[in-house]
């Protein structure tokens, strides 16, 4: 735990019921769960764990918690244990009930609202514990505090056992065990890697906090034979986070540049390091919550970075006259983490995608302006390496502009000429239209015949696509495999990307559910992530989910999109006759489906399954692409060996 964060906590304050403030009741959660956890899919299921862990991390931020343990138990129940102070158990004045009961049964009750319990905190608008309780079939909480162990039990938000003392202890902390409610969620299967990724992130963001995650399920879809457990603790905090992001890349400078500062109760820290790639990775957080759409803190960082490097370049003579480098130029090859912790965080959107506090733009900008300038003066070799790369990016940007002009003249793009392979739709309103980017000509043919041509366009991709890992915009523009995608979408790429010119508001990647299909998806996602990021930020990119199985009993036919769904449908079809003959056939590929099958299973808006791609998916794809397509052979070999038998479901 850094000294800056400790300084902003009033650590001497006793944490008791007087700091628990009640704002409103729990009624709405089960009626509209998506409002509180985003969705009732796998994403929402995992969000339950994050909410409980966020409460433990709040204790860490306050300087009281050093170790958090997350256990996936048999039956996909979850236990989260921390060694913090323990949730208060004394009577809360506003309600006359034990504070523990209030925290778990009243929405917006917690130590993060009054300002007395926590100065800074995460959690989805502070609703965590009660929402998890409302959406759990059952939940048990044990609090070790003041020499006693207190226990309370709930079911779907209602008390099944009043708070009582069940023993004595010399420990302190909170232990929560819950089982998600099958009435509320589409799936109950926890994915170890999803939880591991999030917990690793929390460990990086809270230097010195020890987080352990373990999987004690005897059998599960994603579990190898051996026991799974990971313990994470990073004394270097976000410095180590940057090194982790750059682990498969070649840094331009060995030292990670670290900057931090405070204003009142608010703190900000920034860590950055340049590498030899052409991509930019800026990951921002507010109160340990990832802000994938950025916000004021990220804006302040970008503005200061551009200004400082231009000023340094002019001062040292690298930049002549008005030949300034742009924001895109200075961010090429940059990996940066921006983390702020503030008392009154204002997030845009229910899921905290963007930070709205203007004060954070000023704080981060001031810190970077002063401390980065000082670092460059003290480390001129690093300054020169960064400026050389930015100037090279500037020249490449000019080359890309010329390449674009050449391509426009060559392809007639200016006159609106579309790619030969594109089978466009009749409607021209982007809000109503969608384009399927399809793997292979044969699948493209079936899709073209099976589509609804009023609003569905088809673009087949074929052959080997460009490795964008080592490609600048000028190379991308000239690539004959990606050019049709750029032209068909109509919005440009890179710094010229204009969302207003986008011709379709649904861009759907349709590829087989095999290794080749996964490769196509990964490559396209990486391309969109690096050259058309607003497309993903606005939620316009989707992945089609083709079915895996067709089940037939007589004239009745049904399709399944996963093994569990296949088993469920099989049981339903045999409900009246356990010995009924049911034929199960596996779809081998999109190209093997006839147009009618493709329409019914994958393209009909009333029956298809589409998965919206998030920035987190794209970041993961980008990381994997760096390993698989980069020049470093060893990480690629390790990745393939580790995943050959247990293929990780990227859900992309």
Write out the residue ranges for each language-model feature.
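Conserved short strand/loop->alpha-helix "switch" segment adjacent to the catalytic nucleotide/phosphoryl-transfer site
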Residues: 31-50
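C-terminal interaction appendages of subunits in large macromolecular complexes
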Residues: 395-414, 429-434, 445, 449-451, ...
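Residues immediately C-terminal
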Residues: 58-59, 86-87, 515-516
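GHKL-family ATPase ATP-binding module
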Residues: 1-16, 26, 50, 58-60, ...
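Short conserved segment of the HATPase_c
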Residues: 87-110
